[in-house]
Structure formats: structure tokens, C-alpha cells
């Protein structure tokens, strides 16, 4: 079956953690997400990248995905160490998608990315990346459906063509998950049983995985509030506390809760980290 991606518009930082007092946490990009922090979240206005769209992107929800996280221990989303597989770049170009995807009818966006600040060596893409133009001998495809430079020096600028969501385009048949991958994407830590009960209540009467996912998304959007105020004291079960007690939080709580609620229903899921939208000029 398919695995659902739940996007985090921005994630807790790692590289800047030592630059500020412990009671403050700066938003940014990281290869892990930590829940249950106390203090206050400060949104960073430091530009992370400049982008240029070469064709019309009207109506496109600009979500720049960096990587995905599948392991969750109750407080932290992370991935096991993954060396990935090389994708050779021939004459500055590499194909990232299978032929079936390349032949799929639907909308494409052609864009340029200029990375501006440290984001490890992660490459960011819209939608489903199909082709990249980059001044590097190779890039690395990770098991988490992401791409990185592998530590190689490159110009920090690249162009790409991506397939973007199009309701008129026929869906692809999702590849079958291995039993090992399915176990990872269904794993849930010990938590308040009310989380699974809430997931069943919210999705009652919904027959498909997609319908259940949309029901959970709608519930979180309409019944919970957004705040940058973090917890005043630590809790043992951050997801359960968010869903059943506090009912407000920042992006990490919404995405984590949706992914875990899906998993309690037997629907494989993981969170995708990156950035959403931006300033236009």
C-alpha cells in the first residue's frame, strides 16, 4: 500500500541550537524533529533559499520538501543512518523519476533554487521531482525519499522540473511496501490510548485511507489552535498531551499527531520536513 506524507512547513533547528538561551528555540530546517520542548519558539526570518518559477505556478501550493522522517520514539522523529544511493549527473542533468512518472499526464513546474543558508546538504523540491540540472558529478538519493549532495562541493544553485498535484491526472499505482518498511511506518510508541480512540471517532464512516487522512486533517485544522508558546513543563507523551489536553501547538505537533493517528488506524505514514511558501518579489 501507499505511505502517506505529512508535511512540516518548518522544523526545529539543529545547527543554531547552541547560539541562543535554552528557553528559546529557533525555527528552521533539521533532519530530526523534537517534541515536548519547553520555553518559546521564535520564528526565524533568515532567508534559506531564493527560488524562481519559470512557468506559471498559479494555484500551486508551494511546499519545498527536504526529507522525510519515519522513526518516532514518542518525542523525536528521526531516521536511521542511511548512506543512500548515488544518482549520476550527466552533462549537468539527472533523471530522478521512473519512466512511468515521466509519462504521467499532468502539470509540471520548472523552477530554480539558490540555497542561501546552511541546510546540511539537503536539496529541496516541489511536488514529485522528475529532472534536475545541477553542477555536480552526482547526488545522493536517500531511503527517506530525499536527495542530498553527499557533502560534495557544488554551486548551491540548481534547476528542476517537478510534477505537482493535479486532481485531473490519473493516480499512479503505488509500489508495494516491504513488510519491514510497513512495520517502520506503522510503529507507534507507548502513549495515551485516547489518541487511537480519537482517530477512530474522527474517521468513523470513512472507507478509504485517503478519506480517513482528509478527515483527520480537517479535524486538526478546525478543532486545534496554533501557538509558538511551548510547554511550561515537560510531559511524557507530547502527542497525547497536544491532542487530548492542550489542544494547541506549532507545526510539529499538528504533523506528528496526524501521522500517529493514521498509524493507529493501520495506515503507513511519515512526516516530511521542509519549508512552505515564502515572500514574493
Language model segments and positions:
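Helix-boundary/low-complexity linker signature
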Residues: 1-281
Amino acid at each position: 500500500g501507499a505511505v502517506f506524507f505529512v508535511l512540516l512547513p518548518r522544523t526545529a533547528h539543529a545547527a543554531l541550537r547552541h547560539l541562543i538561551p535554552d528557553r528559546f528555540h529557533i525555527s528552521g530546517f533539521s533532519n530530526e524533529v523534537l517534541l515536548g520542548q519547553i520555553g518559546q519558539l521564535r520564528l526565524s526570518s533568515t532567508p534559506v533559499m531564493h527560488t524562481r518559477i519559470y512557468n506559471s505556478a498559479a494555484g500551486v501550493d508551494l511546499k519545498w520538501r527536504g526529507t522525510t522522517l519515519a522513526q518516532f520514539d514518542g518525542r523525536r522523529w528521526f531516521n536511521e543512518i542511511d548512506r543512500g544511493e548515488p544518482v549520476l549527473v550527466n552533462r549537468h542533468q539527472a533523471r530522478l523519476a521512473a519512466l512511468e512518472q515521466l509519462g504521467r499526464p499532468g502539470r509540471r513546474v520548472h523552477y530554480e533554487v539558490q540555497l542561501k543558508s546552511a541546510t546540511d546538504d539537503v536539496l529541496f523540491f516541489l511536488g514529485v521531482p522528475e529532472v534536475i540540472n545541477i553542477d555536480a558529478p552526482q547526488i545522493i538519493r536517500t531511503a527517506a525519499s530525499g536527495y542530498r549532495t553527499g557533502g560534495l562541493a557544488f554551486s548551491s544553485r540548481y534547476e528542476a522540473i517537478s510534477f505537482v498535484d493535479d486532481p485531473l491526472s490519473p493516480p499512479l499505482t503505488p509500489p508495494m511496501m516491504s513488510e519491514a518498511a510497513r512495520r517502520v511506518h506503522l510503529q507507534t510508541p507507548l502513549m495515551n490510548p485516547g489518541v487511537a480512540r480519537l482517530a477512530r471517532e474522527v474517521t468513523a464512516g470513512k472507507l478509504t485511507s485517503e478519506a480517513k487522512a482528509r478527515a483527520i486533517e480537517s479535524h486538526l485544522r478546525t478543532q486545534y489552535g496554533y501557538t509558538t508558546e511551548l510547554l511550561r513543563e515537560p510531559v511524557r507523551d507530547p502527542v497525547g498531551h497536544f491532542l487530548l489536553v492542550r489542544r494547541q501547538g506549532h507545526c510539529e505537533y499538528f504533523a506528528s499527531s496526524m501521522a500517529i493517528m493514521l498509524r493507529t488506524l493501520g495506515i503507513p505514514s511519515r512526516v516530511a520536513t521542509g519549508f512552505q511558501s515564502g515572500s514574493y518579489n
